[in-house]
């Protein structure tokens, strides 16, 4: 097994039902999938980084067609078993060079994974496979919030201004929203500096991604099992805030809905 390969990291960081994670993280997962379900109705959908089986049944039932890709063979193999009986298509594929024909999808979804990709190659491919007027929907961590930590294996994080610029370069019309405001900004800013040094030593120097992940999980408190069904997740009443000036240093999660303007 290629322990430190990108595919291995993708498999390790995929959130599967039954996995133990900090309770607060359930809110992030539930929120992003419920946002997606509001966009799925009668659409041909492509989910990039399909990974986990969370909300697959709901997406399949709402959509006209569901297609999912993941670069990890292990993720797709497990997903095929857990989604047996659902009318969907799953492939091992690279989001930077996809197998699909032009103008194939109404909606492309990329949840909490765009920072693992070459953004320009990714957007070029999404532009190609989206139908005119189609939607790219993704969520990502806000790099401008104090306390931000990059994920092991990630390539690059963009702030909202940078996202706006590159999306418009590819002729998308983006709308941004922020969710889950950070607390104690000043205190977290100082704490983040210390944590970044610790992380650099564990991940970059020692190469121990799994140790860092476990340490971060324990720092967030007690762990809980990820439910199998989306309606078993805790109810999330988080209200999103529209971001109009392309700058935000408060919200931990950024949601972007971009229309294919071509």
What are these regions (language model features)?
Residues 121-135:
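A short glycine-rich, Lys/Arg-flanked "PGG" loop and its adjoining helix->strand segment in the class I
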Residues 172-183:
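Conserved S-adenosyl-L-methionine
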Residues 109:
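A conserved beta-strand element that flanks and buttresses the S-adenosyl-L-methionine
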Residues 1-40, 43-51, 58:
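Conserved class I S-adenosyl-L-methionine
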Residues 137, 184-262:
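A C-terminal cap/extension of S-adenosyl-L-methionine-dependent methyltransferases
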Residues 147-165:
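Acceptor-substrate binding/catalytic loop of class I
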Residues 52-97:
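Class I SAM-dependent methyltransferase SAM/SAH-binding core
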């Amino acid at each position: 097994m290629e322990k430190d390969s990108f595919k291995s990291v993708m498999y390790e960081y995929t959130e599967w039902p039954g996995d133990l994670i900090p309770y607060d993280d359930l809110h992030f997962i539930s929120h992003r999938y419920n946002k997606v379900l509001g966009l799925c109705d009668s659409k041909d959908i492509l989910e990039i980084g399909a990974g986990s089986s969370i909300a697959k049944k709901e997406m399949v039932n709402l959509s006209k067609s569901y297609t999912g890709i993941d670069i990890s063979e292990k993720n797709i193999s497990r997903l095929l078993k857990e989604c047996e009986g659902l009318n969907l298509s799953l492939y091992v594929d690279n989001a930077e060079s996809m197998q699909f024909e032009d103008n194939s999808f109404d909606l492309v979804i990329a949840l909490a994974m765009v920072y693992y990709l070459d953004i320009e190659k990714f957007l070029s491919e999404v532009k190609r496979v989206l139908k005119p007027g189609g939607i790219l929907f993704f969520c990502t961590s806000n790099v401008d919030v104090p306390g931000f930590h990059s994920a092991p294996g990630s390539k690059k994080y963009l702030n909202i201004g940078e996202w706006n610029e590159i999306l418009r370069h590819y002729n998308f019309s983006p709308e941004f929203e922020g969710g889950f405001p950070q607390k104690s900004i000043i205190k977290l800013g100082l704490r983040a500096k210390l944590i970044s040094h610790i992380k650099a030593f564990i991940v970059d120097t020692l190469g121990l991604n799994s140790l860092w992940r476990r340490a971060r999980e324990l720092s967030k408190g007690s762990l809980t099992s990820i439910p199998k069904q989306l309606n078993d997740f805790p109810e999330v009443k988080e209200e999103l805030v529209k971001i109009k000036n392309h700058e935000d240093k408060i919200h931990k999660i950024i949601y972007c809905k971009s229309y294919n303007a071509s």
